[in-house]
């Protein structure tokens, strides 16, 4: 028998908006973890392996408009085994709060705020599923083997924290802020051993990058940035041999320059 483990890529954060009551971009969701035992006789001499890429960060804006959306993380696969990537963060809005990206699951991926399947309807969204981004735009929820969801971007407030993952998936990023000079910390990745990729730390400048995953560890999410005018969000932690963390959301801008770019998702 051969045990194969795979981890999906992290979704990227959305870029911040500009003018009005602008919100920071929301953060991307973390990629999922999945594993399967194969009989040696069932494997071909060569098998197709795909490594899920992290999403590229949502674009900033230099005129009065909403920020660019992030990009969902790619799926990682070995033969029939798949771990899906995390959902994209949304670009900041000029007037409303925006939801974060959902965590990747083991049966399906997440393109926006809904976590990947399976979903039990609980806050954890199932033992193997990815977490949904909260409907109230608050802190991202934790995943099990799925990824944590990204924190939302909020108008005239600090962005929300990202959700972690308890058992091998990656953490979601934290949302970009608006009108404040600090940012929230992001969710930590899960682990199937004893350590994990750390979540990006809160900061007063560009957001902190998530810690890279190591052997069988999920990468941490990147934090949203917190400059009073503009700045860029931290990238999700690269997977290494683990899931990619979600990128943080980009900072809003009050009309004197460009908004922040969303953080890139970590690779699977």
Q: Could you say what each language-model-derived stretch is?
A:
Residues 6-79, 95, 103, 108, ...:
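Glycine-rich strand-loop-strand elements at beta-sheet edges
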Residues 28, 54-57, 70-73, 91, ...:
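Collagen triple-helix signature
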Residues 6-10, 87-91, 130-136:
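Short, hydrophobic/aliphatic alpha-helical segments
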Residues 79-93:
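Short peripheral tails and domain-boundary helices/loops at the edges of structured domains
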Residues 43, 103-110, 122, 136, ...:
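Generic hydrophobic, helix-prone segments enriched in Leu/Val/Ile
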Residues 87, 101-105, 116, 151:
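Alpha-helical transmembrane segments and their immediate interhelical/interface regions
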Residues 2-4:
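Aromatic-lined ligand-binding clefts that engage carbohydrates, nucleic acids, or primary amines
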